[in-house]
Amino acid sequence: MPQFDITSPVALARGSYHLITLVQRECEKIFSSMGFNIEDYSEIVTDYECFEALNIPKHHPARDMQDTYYLDNGQLLKSHTSAAQNAILKKYGKGLIENGTPIKAIFPGRCFRNEATDACHENTFFQMEGVMVDKDISISNLIYFMKTMLSEVFKKDIKVRLRPGFFPFVEPGFELDISCLICGGEGCPSCKHSGWLELCPCGMIHPNVLREGGIDPEKYTGFAFGLGLTRLAMMKYGIKDIRVLNSGNIKALKQFK
C-alpha cells in the first residue's frame, strides 16, 4: 500500500464570490453612497406582508397557488421583496414625520415563485427592493436614481425605457427595460428576440400602501422599485441562460474571481 504524507503542503484553491453576490454588493455600495440604508428581511413571510399590506386584494391572481409557495402553517415564501415594504415604512416613518428625514432604504433577497423555468425565468431568483418617501417625490426622482445606478454598474450610459405596467402597490406603475447588452438590441433568446430585457418593475407607491405603513399620502409621496439582481448579473457578465446561475457549475463560476 503506498504511503502518503498528509503533512505535505499543497496548493490551496482560491474561492470566489458568486456573481449575483458581486452584483448585489456593487448595488449596495452605489445606493449606500446615495444615502440609502441597507436592510435584511426574512424569506418566510405572512399573507399580510406579501399581499394585504401591498394593496393586493384576496381575489388577485398573484395569490394563486401556481404562483406562490404556501407553507402548511399559512405562511409563505416571499414571491417578491416588496413583502418588506410595510415593515420598512413603519421602521423609518417616525423619523420622516417627526424629523423630516426621508425614508431611503434597499432590501435585497431571494424570491420564490412556482413557475416553469426557461432562459430568462427561474423559480428562485434575487431582487433588490428600494423605496424612497418624502415630500414632493416624483417619477423624475425614480428615473434619476435608476439611471445613476445603472451607469455605475455598467460604467457607461445605458439605454432604458419605461413601459406602463400594473402592480397593485404602485400607481402609476412601470416596467423599466434595459437594452439587451447580450445581443446589442438585435434580439436573442434571453430577451425573447425583442432587443429589450425586463429589469425592474417600479412606480410611485400607492396611497393605500403608504397609509397602511403609517404614512399620510396627502403629505408624502414615494417611489418603489424591485430590481432584478439575477437579470442584472446576466447583463453585466454576458450570461445568456439564467439557469446557469443556479447550476452549481464551479467551472463557470471560477471565471468571476
Where is each model-derived feature located?
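TRNA-recognition modules of translation machinery and tRNA-sensing kinases, especially anticodon-binding
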Residues: 1-257
